[in-house]
Amino acid sequence: MSATSTLIVKARARSWESIHSVALTCPAQTLKQAAEITCYCSRKRKRFQRKKRKGSLPLSNVTRIGPGAWQISHPFLGENEIIGSYLLAGQNELAIIDPGPGSMVESLLESIREAGFDPQEVTHILITHVHLDHAGSAGTLVRQLPKAQVYTHKKGAPHLLDTTKVVASASRIYGERMKLLWGEIESTPQERLSIIEGGDILNIAGRRLEVHYTPGHAIHHVVFFDVHSGELFAGDVAGVRLQDVDYVRPPTPPPDLDLEAWSDSISLVKSLRPDVLYIGHFGAIKNIAEHFDRLREKLSSWGEFVLGAMRDGKEEAEIISMLIEHTKPELLRAARDPHAIERYEIATNYPMTVQGYMRYWRKKHPERL
């Protein structure tokens, strides 16, 4: 198998991003590679489980980012600083923003303790969007945290209220790897779920958080903006930029990708003039205008690249290979570490990137094909 083909298989095997969506729209060729994927994931799983048994698994990394605020790095498959949550504390309330996947529940609870709090005192779980890497643990957490109420956009609520279809679809794709990757995916009881929309104000943990609707990456995406501190919790609307790597990558999974809506969401966030963005993948961004300019350019240029390949009659697998070869050199120059490619693949992988763009062009702009 070529290096490029191997990367594609790895990316398919580690489709963390938006699995609740992809499980319902997964193309046939993804499933046809199941044997190769299973072999790769089996090796990865065994290495990961050996680390757990030996006690060498990286621990959660809890960092205080300001008064009453902590950043939590989950050790997802042994890799830190790829998936993050945020903890807010104040006025006898504890709020978690994007609690992460179900496989990281114990990591999250231990991180809250490490920050000096009792997880049983968590009162609010705020969801930027309901993709499993951000919100997969919500249903499990409300069963363990008696005071916690979940807040999500109305378009994301059905995915949390009933996860039966999501679990069944994802299980067909991941099989025995399902629990390792995502843990338990439990439904959230209706009485423990509150609906939020753009324009709402949440007075939580001593903060006044504005809710802004920011579709583009997902139709159920919102951000939370603290006007007084200037902190904006951005989910995935600000893209992916891992720590110590000056490289922005667009996470464009199906089925909700909408480039026009995303551009409008970027303009909205910039108009708020936040002092810092806290993103899910991963951490703080302070050069906000430059960051969004790069993201907007990448969203457009990668989309045009995929469109050009579709016009040339290329199939999905070939377009994935082409996009990898087209974009990999820039990431390597920015990271100076080949391992950065795999880390970015965990956060958002090439197959889903291409699938998202292909669906977007076919659904939104068939006249350009």
Regions found by a protein language model. Name each.
Residues 59-115, 224-234:
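Conserved beta-strand hairpin/beta-sheet module of binuclear metal-dependent hydrolase folds
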Residues 64, 101-103, 159-213, 219-289:
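Metallo-beta-lactamase
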Residues 95, 126, 150, 231-233, ...:
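Residue-level marker for buried hydrophobic side chains located in beta-strands
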Residues 305-369:
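C-terminal regulatory/interaction regions
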Residues 2-6, 10-21, 26, 39-45:
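Low-acidity, Ser/Thr- and Arg-rich intrinsically disordered low-complexity segments
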Residues 106-152:
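Active-site metal-binding motif and surrounding structural segment of the metallo-beta-lactamase
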Residues 288-297:
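Histidine/acidic-residue-rich catalytic or RNA/ligand-binding cores of hydrolases
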